[in-house]
Every structure is written in structure tokens, then in C-alpha cells.
Amino acid sequence: MRPARALIDLQALRHNYQLAREHRGGKALAVIKADAYGHGAVRVAQALEAQADGFAVACIEEALELRAAGIRAPVLLLEGFFEADELALIVEHNFWTVVHSTWQLEAIEQAQLAKPLTVWLKIDTGMHRVGLYPHEYQAAYQRLLVTGKVARIVLMSHFARADELNSGCSDEQFAVFESFRKGLAAEISLKNSPAVLGWPHIPSDWSRPGIMLYGATPFGQAHPLADRLQPVMTLESKIISVRELPAGEAVGYGATFVCDRPLRIGVVAMGYADGYPRHAPTGTPVQIDGQPSRLLGRVSMDMLCVDLTGVPQAGLGSRVELWGKHVLASEVATRAETIPYEIFCNLRRVPRIYSQD
């Protein structure tokens, strides 16, 4: 069997959720969209269901997968519904739905529903993706109330730059939110992972932790709370070939790395088809049999090369950690000029092995 695999530490997941819930985030919906950022949505939901206040996914297909697996906790559709006929399924399965557009509001007004909805009414305070315009917000709230088809409304927005701790954008967005929700009697939800960790003075009845659940920092700098996160995924494989190369020899496609001295090279069963970032450069950290080392040359579809020169005991079958508890996913992502969200979500054919502790 090919040795590439992702080890998922469910106890670390629970620890990270509890950190989100405790740190001024109010109740917390665990965000498990995109297959729980590559960690496996059903297994993550099963691990958290007894602890979590609910879950959030992107769309009804992801929510239905959870219900089919027996998950009965509240599930919020972060992008709401895409077609009006989804409302019947939302009611049938007790999903909560975001409303971010006037057409969705009109669909609710026109729908014949078996029971009332829980709606999270989204205002665009500066992200400028989806959300009602601020001047529409109060009227939309009142329209939902008078339909008689909505049992509960939560007021929500989303911060564009909460991961930038020196930016005033989050405070500016909060000021817009406060101005246009004035007089509306409802709970609020504003905080994603960076807002939970980095903006404690901004209130929120509900938080929506995502990347922090999986143990990756949303910040590009050290942060005391983010430093308490525990990595959930360890991506690992093994050495399948060893080469002794003299100075002047090149490694991999494009000969982008040339040995400046005699080097001992290990070939690892891991490549960009598995989800390891192709653009990770020479020098990206790895760990081999517990010792730090580095990536060499270009990442191939199924293989990559590492430096064994400083790890003389390593050889065929040696364990290689690509990211996890000793090699931070955030550092690998930074070297590859991307973000942890992307490298987690890109994992495709690597089997996941779950542990409870």
C-alpha cells in the first residue's frame, strides 16, 4: 500500500473548538464546509456533535450528507439556498439558512412552508461578496417578520480583514453593522476564526470558527491565543528511494535545484496529486524520523525529494512529516505562497486515519 496518509487527531479538534467557544465568541458553529477543510466532514461532525452548538456548511448538499450520517445538530447553510425549491428540504431537515439577497427574501415570502424557518440575515458591511446592502437591512428584517414564516432571525456579517491585526477595517465594519442593526431585537454573529482570536472587544452571540478548528493560525504573525491551537492533521509518508548525488547534479523536473556539495537525497511518496503544494520551494521544512530537514527541487505529481544529508540514520521506509505537529501547515503554506485553508482543502487521494487521543 502506498504510504501517504493524513492522521486526524480528533482530541486536538475538540480542544480547538473549546478554545473558540471559551474566548468571547459566544456559542460556536463549527464550520465544516469543503469536507471540513479536507479533514472529513462526517467524522469531524461526529467527533464534535456532543460538544458543538451546531455546524456550518456552504450548501444544502453538504448539509444533507451530515443528516444522512445521523447528525441531528443544527446546520447552517452559509450561502443560503440557490433555488427556491430548496426551501422545502431546508424545512424538512431543520436546517438554518442564510439570507443574503432580496431574491431569497422574495422566495420565502412566496413559499408555502410546513413550518417556520430560522434565518441568518446577512448584511454587507464591507466584504462586498454577498449580503444585503446596509440601506436594505432594516426593511428586510421587517419583511421576514411579517411573513409569519420565520421563527427566529440571527443578524450576521463577515469581516474582510480580521486576519490583519493592525488593520482598522474590522472595527469599521462593526460600526457599520451597529449602525444599521439598531433597534433590531435579535442575536448577532460576526466572528470567524481571526475575529475570535484577535478581536475580543467585538461582541458576538454566535461565532463561526473554521480554520482554527483544524489547528492552523489565521495570522501571518505570532499570536498568544493562536499559539494554543493544536494541529489536527499530520500529513505523512515514507522514503521510497535514496540517491547519493555529487556536487553539480540536479534534482527533479526543470533542474531547479543543483547540489552545491555531495548530498544524500530521499524520494518521498507524496506529490501535488495528493494535495501537497506544487509551488513549495526548495527549503520548505519537513521532518524525517523526528529530525528537521528540507524539500529539494520541484514537487512532482506523485513524489517529492528531501535532503537526507543531515539525517544519516534515515533510509528506505523512514517516516516523513510534511506538515502536522512538528512542521506547521501555516509555514508550508507561506513557503508555497498560499494559505493553510487551500492546502488542507486540496488533499484528494490521501487516506485519512482518525484517532481519538
UniProtKB/Swiss-Prot annotation:
Entry EC no(s): 5.1.1.1
Cofactors named for this entry: pyridoxal 5'-phosphate
Pfam family, one: Ala_racemase_N
Catalytic reactions on record: L-alanine = D-alanine
Matches recorded under SMART domains: Ala_racemase_C
Binding site for substrate: 129, 301
SUPFAM superfamilies in alphabetical order: Alanine racemase C-terminal domain-like, PLP-binding barrel
InterPro entries: Ala_racemase, Ala_racemase/Decarboxylase_C, Ala_racemase_C, Ala_racemase_N, Ala_racemase_pyridoxalP-BS, PLP-binding_barrel
Active site per UniProt: 33, 253
Presence of keyword Glycoprotein: no
Keywords: Isomerase, Pyridoxal phosphate
PROSITE patterns tied to this protein: ALANINE_RACEMASE
GO molecular function: alanine racemase activity; pyridoxal phosphate binding
Gene3D superfamilies noted in UniProt: Alanine racemase, Lyase, Ornithine Decarboxylase, Chain A, domain 1
Pathway linked to the protein: Amino-acid biosynthesis; D-alanine biosynthesis; D-alanine from L-alanine: step 1/1
GO cellular component, one term: cytosol
Sequence similarity: Belongs to the alanine racemase family.
Described purpose of this protein according to its UniProt entry: Catalyzes the interconversion of L-alanine and D-alanine. May also act on other amino acids.
Name under which the protein is recorded: Alanine racemase
The organism of origin for this protein: Pseudomonas savastanoi pv. phaseolicola (strain 1448A / Race 6)
